[in-house]
Amino acid sequence: MPTNLFRFILALMLLPLLWTGAGAQTVSFPELSSTLPGRTDVTYLDLAKTVIPDLASDGQGFYKGGLPIEMRHIAGPDSGGSPPETSSFPNAAVLPIKAGGKDRLAMLFDLGDSPDSAEGYAILALYDVTAKPKLLDAANVAVDRSTYFREPNKLSIGAGDDMLITMSTHFNSSQGYVITPLIMVRDDRFELIDMIYTFDERLCAYSRKQDVAFQSIADGRPYAAVKVTVTDSTVPSDESCDDAPPEASSRDISVTYHWDKKTSRYVADSDALAKLSAENEKRF
């Protein structure tokens, strides 16, 4: 099956997860040829071409283009791979956000596989569309094969600021790997807060799932604290298996990120999620 078709089918399968609750009202997948709300002079394709200059419709419901503009990886210069020489996708995820008290528009483009990395290549672009559209920033945010916004997609961390939540994932027959970057915008530039690593598996005797919840907590600092809770649940199956099923169990692992004025970044109050990631690696 062609890679881009597989990604399209996977995206359809993940829609219930990606569009749950508040996410259904915030992320959209407009036709790229359509104009922005309240505008007649700018299309989403116009915005997309600021990061993929030769992007054009193939007349069959997809948009094809060559190399994107140069950009950094959100996790730093030692992360990520090269972009594909050509890419094809049906649409892009669009998310209105607040940054620095201003209205901004984020768009997420999954370009497919990287030619020199196991990770894919996904562009997160930031636009000012209040007047003449302007690309403010763009970064590769892929940290696994397929990349999306993750519900709730954004989280308010101040009266005029939102944190963005993306996810990169891949699956095999019994395991699901998910990495969730938390990204803020400062001075119209994306900054990585942290990445949350979770791991699901479904075996004959049991299934184990790790769900993630996010909460902002006002604490009197320039940006609100962000509490991340991973609920790690094990559910025994009713199947007849060689191995005895474990007992049902559930535990919450939480970390709160506080804004540190001295370092001008978010700092975790514990290494609990890092320890969970290390535990998960032993089960791969």
What are the roles of these predicted feature ranges?
Residues R72-N91, A142-P152, R202-R208, S277-N280:
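Repeat-based blade/solenoid architectures
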Residues R104-D110, D161-T169, P222-V230:
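Short beta-strand elements that form the blades of beta-propeller/WD-repeat-like
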Residues D103-I157:
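A glycine-rich, hydrophobic loop/mini-helix early in the fold
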Residues P90-G101, R150-G160, A213-R221:
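Structural signature of eukaryotic scaffold interfaces centered on beta-propeller domains
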Residues I9-L18:
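Bacterial N-terminal signal peptides
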